[in-house]
From Swiss-Prot:
PANTHER family: PHOSPHOENOLPYRUVATE CARBOXYKINASE (ATP), PHOSPHOENOLPYRUVATE CARBOXYKINASE ATP. Involved in the gluconeogenesis. Catalyzes the conversion of oxaloacetate (OAA) to phosphoenolpyruvate (PEP) through direct phosphoryl transfer between the nucleoside triphosphate and OAA. One of its GO terms (biological process) is gluconeogenesis. It catalyses: oxaloacetate + ATP = phosphoenolpyruvate + ADP + CO2. One of its GO terms (cellular component) is cytosol. SUPFAM superfamilies: PEP carboxykinase N-terminal domain, PEP carboxykinase-like. Keywords: ATP-binding, Cytoplasm, Decarboxylase, Gluconeogenesis, Lyase, Manganese, Metal-binding, Nucleotide-binding. Pathway: Carbohydrate biosynthesis; gluconeogenesis. Coiled coil: none annotated. It comes from Bacteroides fragilis (strain ATCC 25285 / DSM 2151 / CCUG 4856 / JCM 11019 / LMG 10263 / NCTC 9343 / Onslow / VPI 2553 / EN-2). ATP binds at residues 207, 226, 243-251, 292, 328, 444-445, 450. This is Phosphoenolpyruvate carboxykinase (ATP). Its cofactor is Mn(2+).
């Protein structure tokens, strides 16, 4: 199959194409002698290869653009003065220049072409072709997307979307093109193409295609979600976990008592919940074999570590964050033992869990939400942004990211809320807000307590527990749950002086109210104000 013709993309003089290379070929290619700089992979003591991504150790949201043309003009959620987001417009002229730069970089080279699927449902999946010159980038997309069988590859035909990764090329004339820097990640919805220039961060390819699924699916009545998902062992019901980076999506959905559907990107259609991906992209800072055995054990041959500190003899130091807090590993989903097979999809969700890591120490560890509160807190998408998932952020700061994933939303946030609510109403799913962050003790709520809370949500015991209502937010919270320290369930009890909680709660409630004002431009948004905090 290596007789692909790339000249239709403008790529010429290709000396060799490695088309969907095997893991063994990828391993040999990314560790071969003579590789320099960020192309070089280092074999670690666990068998996985580690690579470094240079100055970009996270996505670069300031460098994300959509070409403004008839395909995008009236549908994309463009950034505006009233509501800033990452969907910045780029001209057709700038696109032509950027595409030419990418094509020039990839011409006269030995290339990797990886044909993948995005979306586990055959009827709505997207065929995505990645073209790159760097072996480990081909490894990354092989891990992260759905790998076609030999038969599917033979009948693959033309892709629905093409990503050109020219990480070695720079946009030196970015000012005259109206861009932000020498780096660019740009999408063209008319030609169905993405170009990546001057960033080596693997996540740009993964999240790029997520932005595209987030564009297409809601327009065809499918909820598109930045969440992890799992099912009970019998496969009778699913649970979904929304949350921003570092709030526990991967950790909490990877559960020995449940089967994993996926850890980050899903759709919910009339049949149920399905994964967009074929792999996981887990944070590994301070990874500990005892508290996260599944993720630790997934780090073996074929897994790909990013920006982890590795000694010359291959010894890994997971605690070292000198390069970045956002150290990662990508691995094919079958590296996790308990997964839904053969296709990563499950039945309708019965529980919808919103994860927030609250650095203010205000939110209860778990709140039972009514339907209006569910919409309010989904649109608010609150967490304290944790260190290092994006450039230039190292201290926890409050973040409101609509639908727990504003960075990846290509349509207006209310569209995602609308589709999610439709599915929840159809199936009678319940919503819960879980704080995986801090409380008045100054310590982070333990993974053990959070797992106990998740167990109580999934086995229904939370719905039978005695409850009380927390002021300012009107959250209904349980006063006791099996296996959870009862002293943490009311956050006021974790403060030496409960008045401290009151003060912080007022501050946080005010932030929610101020943030939600941007959704009150229409009737639906106005109606939800009453479900939010009150001062």
């Amino acid at each position: 199959m290596a007789n692909l013709d790339l000249s239709k993309y403008g790529i010429t003089g290709v000396t060799e194409i490695l088309h969907n290379p095997s893991y063994d070929v990828l391993f040999a290619e990314e560790t071969k002698p003579g590789l320099e700089g960020f192309e070089k992979g280092q074999v670690t003591e666990l068998g996985a290869v580690n690579v470094m991504t240079g100055v970009y150790t996270g996505r670069s949201p300031k460098d994300k653009f959509f070409v403004k043309n008839e395909a995008s003009e009236n549908s994309v959620w463009w950034t505006s003065e009233e509501y800033k987001n990452d969907n910045k417009p780029c001209s057709e002229e700038a696109w032509a220049d950027l595409k030419a730069k990418a094509v020039k970089e990839l011409s006269n080279k030995r290339l990797f072409v990886v044909d993948t699927f995005c979306g586990a449902n055959e009827g709505t999946r997207m065929k995505v072709r990645f073209i790159m010159e760097v072996a480990w980038q081909a490894h990354f997309v092989t891990n992260m997307f759905i790998r076609p069988t030999a038969e599917e590859l033979a009948n693959y035909g033309e892709p629905d979307f093409v990503c050109f990764n020219a990480s070695k090329a720079k946009v030196d004339n970015y000012k005259e093109l109206g861009l932000n820097s020498e780096t660019a990640t740009v999408f063209n919805l008319k030609t169905k193409e993405q170009v990546i220039l001057n960033t080596w961060y693997g996540g740009e390819m993964k999240k790029g295609m997520f932005s595209i699924m987030n564009y297409m699916n809601p327009l065809r009545g499918i909820a598109s979600m930045h969440c992890s998902a799992n099912t009970d062992m019998e496969g009778t019901s699913s649970a979904i976990f929304f949350g921003l980076s570092g709030t526990g999506k991967t950790t909490l959905s990877t559960d020995p008592k449940r089967k994993l559907i996926g850890d980050d990107e899903h759709g919910w259609d009339n049949e149920g919940v399905f994964n967009y991906e074929g792999g996981c992209y887990a944070k590994v800072i301070n990874l500990d074999k005892e508290s996260e055995p599944d993720i630790f054990n997934a780090i073996k041959r074929d897994a790909l570590l990013e920006n982890v500190t590795v000694a010359a003899d291959g010894k890994i130091n997971f605690a070292d964050k000198s390069v970045t807090e956002n150290t990662r590993v990508s691995y094919p989903i079958y590296h996790i033992e308990n997964i839904v097979k053969p296709v990563s999809k499950g039945p309708h969700a019965k529980q919808v869990i919103f994860l927030s890591a609250d650095a203010f120490g205000v939110l209860p560890p778990v709140s039972i939400l009514n339907p209006e509160q569910a919409q309010y807190y989904f649109l608010s998408g609150f967490t304290a942004k944790l260190a290092g998932t994006e450039r230039g952020i190292t201290e926890p700061t409050p973040t409101f990211s609509a639908c727990f994933g504003a960075a990846f939303l290509s349509l207006h946030p209310t569209k995602y809320a609308e589709e999610l609510v439709k599915k929840m109403e159809m199936t009678g799913a319940k919503a819960y807000l879980v704080n995986t962050g801090w409380n008045g003790s100054g310590k982070r709520i333990s993974i053990k307590d959070t797992r106990g809370i998740i167990d109580a949500i999934l086995d229904g015991s939370i719905d039978k527990a005695p409850t009380k209502v927390i002021p300012f937010f009107d959250f209904v919270v349980p006063t006791e749950l099996p296996g959870v320290d009862p002293k943490i369930l009311d956050p006021r009890d974790t403060y030496a002086d409960p008045a401290q909680w009151n003060e912080k709660a007022k501050d946080l409630a005010g932030r929610f109210i101020k943030n939600f004002a941007k959704f009150t431009g229409n009737e639906a948004g106005k109606k939800l104000v009453a479900a939010g905090p009150k001062l």
